Amino acid sequence: MADDHKLCGFLCTVLSVDSPDLLQSGSSCFIFNDGSVTGFKSENGLILSLTNPISNLQSLISSKGDHDVENSGTIEDGRLETPQKRRKCVEGESSGKRKTPKSKRRVLSGSKEKTVQGRKRVKSIGMVNGSISVVQQLHALVANKCLKIICRVVKVDKGENGEERAVVLVDVYLPIELWSGWQFPKSQATAAALFKHLSCDWGLRVSILDGKSIWEEANGRIKAIWDLSDCHVFDCKLLCNAPNSPKRRLFKLHEIFKSLPSPGNHDVSYSSRVLPSTDSCVSGVWDLSDDVLISILMKLDTKDLFSIAAVCRLFRSLTSLIVPCMNLKLFPHQQAAVGWMLERERKAEVSSHPLYLSFDTEDGFSFYVNAVTGDIITEAAPMVKDFRGGMFCDEPGLGKTITALSLILKTQGTMADPPEGLPIVWCTHKSDKKCAYYEYTSDQFTSNSMSAVKRFQSPSSCRNQVSFEAFRPLLESKSLPFKQARLMDPDDQTLESKNSNFENEFETHIPASLDLKAQCRKSLGNVRKNLLPAYNGASELSEVMEAKRISNWKKCGMITGCKRKGLTDSDVESDIWMQCDSCSKWRRIIDEGVSVTGSAWFCSNNNDPAYQSCNDPEELWDKSQPIKYLQGFYTKGASGEESDNISFFTSVLREHKSSVSSTVKKALIWLAKLPLEKLSQMETVGLPGPVLGLKLDALGFQRIFRAFGLKSRVEKGVTKWFYPKFLENLVFDVPALKVALCQPLDTFRLYLSKATLIVVPTNLVNHWLTQIQKHVCSDQLRILVWADHIELSPHSLAWDYDVVITTFSRLSAEWNPRKKSPLIQVHWLRVMLDEGHTLGSSVSLTNKFQMAVSLTACNRWLLTGTPTPNTPNSQLSHIQPLLKFLHEEVYGENPKFWEAGILRPFEAEMEEGRLRLLQLLQRCMISSRKKDLQMIPPCIKKVTYLNFLPGHARSYNELVETVRRNILLADWNDPSHVESLLNSKQWKFRSITISNVRLSCCVAGHIKMTDAGHDIKETMDALLENDLDLWTEEYSFIQDSLIGGCNCKRCGEWCRLPVITPCRHLLCLDCVALDSERCTISGCGYLYEMQTPETLARPENPNPKWPVPKDLIELQPSYKQDDWNPDWQSTSSSKVSYLVDRLRKLHEGNKKSILSFNKTDNDNLEDNPPGTSEAFLGKELHGQDCGSQMVFVDKVLIFSQFLEHIHVIEQQLTTAGIKFGKMYSPMQSYNKMKALAMFQNDADCMALLMDGSGALGLDLSFVTHVFLMEPIWDKSLEEQVISRAHRMGAKRPIFVETLTMRGTIEEQMMRFLEDAEKSDRLLSGDYIEAKQETTRSRRTLHDLVESNYLSHLSFVRSDGKMEFAASQLAGLKDHQLA
């Protein structure tokens, strides 16, 4: 190779050889492509071809059937590219077109749209970069002059079938311009896919060239040559779709979660001891055992524990086990979890970028290639900074809430860390001198420290950022625009910030008059602070209005708006006025000892209790005395441009930022250009304002002018501007205004907080409060539950509380790009999302997700027992939103890296995707599992199959009959028919149908159905043409049966919608479906008129699958029908009957347990010593009644997902006299909590009836039995429900019983879930019934087999006919398989 390229890596690829005798080891070869075949060609012309050539793609796809054809695709740049538009189905011409069955037209009214069948991705080729053959990639890169290669044959092996394969060593060379910034000119993604296979093990390469034994042989053959992946790389470590890989189960997400670190339940022992410094016999702390020391340390608060932990290693280890002010001892797995979470919060580790591959050339030069984008870096290895926080994913019921509270208590009093490079402003708030905040502008954003702040800037907010480029010529002093003066640290060091509104070439300097000290609240003496009314009226308040305000504003018995009683004139002269930074109201400070020089000041700092809230009205000054100082003005004779005035003007402009339009800009420029002689007119006759046209625009700048301190008056239709009255020797500070107009207006302030923000579902607020009240020392934590009606200032939210609890709905409501929420203006110590997986439940951009991501916090935590919903084909995609909330730098901030680096490789079962995911989750997720803990009693599950009661069975069959009739008459169960429920286009209607069928297993219902008289007449006329006599009883019987139903002629079972055959037999759907070619009545055998697929194609079914009985289908009438409606009032449910019987038995057992308990107590009463008070004994026994008795009582949890089913259960439990509580939507929260308290404390209340709204957060560890009234498809939800009882604190085994109706869709689902092998085949794409699905995302597991459920629906028979129906159904299924 020429000197302009370097050897950067190598790989070995495997190819087929037609004539191995002509090929020798060491032979050179070159890559080629003749348009149809890509491979290598040796020097003697021998072709080495791919073992699965791409040219066979079309035949490979075609062999899988029409339903597998997505797009043939094209190979470009070494990748398989898929066209954007689907290939349209070709509609063949049919000479025998027939009308759409009338029974179909009632379903979707004859849709004419062509069907598009679901297609399965062809994994043998692969859509993920890296799974396509490296030979294709090499050819594309060589053709595009991205690299050069040298190839030689190093090994040839022969298989059992006589096939010969060769191993080709490929050396890859890159140009030396790489170290001068060279990048791949084309096909970067292809290059990235190729470089994942390259190796820089130069010792291995030497061994390969020397012919040393590096080949692992099995049965005399080289195993890696014959166990080949799609990439054709010898011994590929990435497992690119290896055939029949035994590691397929490793790509199940629940298997990934199981492999994550679990704290376990082992106690941590410490060997450190305190030793005396001498051999003295004096006793000391070294004589105390660890248990004694721990009991002492548990009495200390957080601050004292921090102090004593610094003494020695023993105390450091002992304090790590203690949670201050917690009223219980943590379990070992909780202690380990708290330790892990503290370690994650202490510091963010810096590590190498997971997507950059490291390479070394043969002569030692290093470079790095991005495995997704193909970007090359030759300098230092790229590094990424880990986030602080993570995902706390203990299984439900293991005490995540207590663990989270322990973390909060361990770090109580710790303030959030501000971003680097910004000064902190310290201030006092309610006697707390350690309050702080910081400010920044848009030009101070950095990629790391302020990335969180960028997120809540919407495009609309960016448009509101004002630029005053036009004012640059006005800067006579060439002053450097600076940040607001109050932004500084305690040492008076200020931030030197640039102004994003100016170009860098302007040279400016800081004027001497600006010392950049903190803004001074000066003694204003006789200054009246209500000089700037917000309305356009008189220059001062009239005495009448003043009196009115005095009469209306009263607080704590003190009248506001006038001089305070008891003040002397000397007090007035020493008066100090302070402006609140939150509400901008002015407060008068009388205490002369108060420091007036500082940063932020708030109403809460006021010594006067009548004015310590921002909600209190502003005080008024009622003396008309000369004003010697006023912000925005300077003393005559001075140069102006005072720092206080610059800050004042800047704050006013920022406050009115939304009002600054082009017209307002012109007015401000006019004001800033006024000379002194013009300003002097404001003292006397008034200065006419700028003429800007529209009155609406004038209102904007007039508000700003008044905020500056100027007064307006209309004289003869002309608005004139004046100085305030009683102004003495002061001039408007125009130079300061010029500087202020050049300040950036997009300033944000964040208040540093010691608080933790906890966001929970609405139904878990009371759970958190209960846990805090029960397990945390009283008054230890300052708690705020932020409800919808509460309005708080940001600084109060940040500094007044240790824990702020709010809901996801509140979080969503707070998102407003045009207005900053108080939540966004706080820099939280920690943000926790309980049940945080709900952020990833939607792929769309929701308000709550945007708000959660926009929150600024040092530490971010997700608490959930179910990180992803149970959606096997798309569940991994739900993790990326969680990573974005956590601000994970690689995969959370860059969706492209997530998709190409983890999601697509993982779904393609490539090892690199699994390893990256595992590496990511092992770093930021922890999960304890119940099976690893020994303190929890077992959970015993069983499924109980029940039979219908006769009335309920008839209701169920009526709905099933309607569904099956639709499917059968749509070209005889053909899923290609666009009006069939099995068709992929009908997925929404199919889901509704399945939900109704599920509900009908629990609740009786009805379909209001009327015949279409015209259609039935057509049917009867057709029968008359087939020799039916109009005046016979047979004619009347058939007509009446089609209208009202009849018994099946073959099996005798009642059918509401019978099928009439051309031979005039009335059959049920089961009997007619036994044979599609002839009548199934014994002795009849009438042959139907069959129509073949070749003549059957039409818009309703462009791709027929099989022949159908044309005359039978067209003979059937259609029926007008309404939706299926549940009727719970009249339901006789066998499920509830079974439940009542079980509850009665448990209730009898409870009575015996309580009687036995009371008898034992009475025996103990006789053993009490003489003289014991009977009243005391009675009180003691009564106290035990609610506690000790509960240990012996069976409590039952009843769960249903359907409100109608809950009503049936509620009705029949009440009738049976069983006392129960209820928690279900839409009950009010108060009633739910009342019912829960009754269930917990009343021994006679043995059952709690609830729906999914109570499946989260409840601690029902005293419950012994759980009844699931219907199968729960989402297994994560089922686990949540069971975990209400099966959790820490449970003392007895938990019995879980799932009630399932026999022979229904419920039984189908239970059988499917119990068959793990079938589930695996379905999820891998091999299950035949799932082939018709489209590419839409599957929401739950049962979505994958919806069509299978409907196609196997069967009627429910009663009593003796069950066996007959079972045999009929078996025969029907065998016929369909045949």
UniProtKB/Swiss-Prot annotation:
Disulfide bond positions: none
Helicase C-terminal domain: residues covered: 1185-1324
Protein's UniProt name: F-box protein At3g54460
Motif DEAH box location, chain numbering: 834-837
Residues annotated as domain Helicase ATP-binding: 720-885
Keyword Ribosomal protein: no
F-box domain segment(s): 282-328
GO MF annotation: an example: zinc ion binding
Biased composition, class Basic and acidic residues, residue ranges: 65-96
Disordered: annotated segments: 65-113
Keywords: ATP-binding, Helicase, Hydrolase, Metal-binding, Nucleotide-binding, Zinc, Zinc-finger
Positions that bind Zn(2+): C580, C583, C603, C614
Composition bias, Basic residues: 97-107
Span of the signal peptide: none
Residues reported in the UniProt entry to bind ATP: D733, V734, P735, A736, L737, K738, V739, A740
GO CC, one annotated term: plasmodesma
Keyword DNA repair among UniProt keywords: no
Zn-finger (CW-type) residues: 571-622
Family the UniProt entry places it in: Belongs to the helicase family.
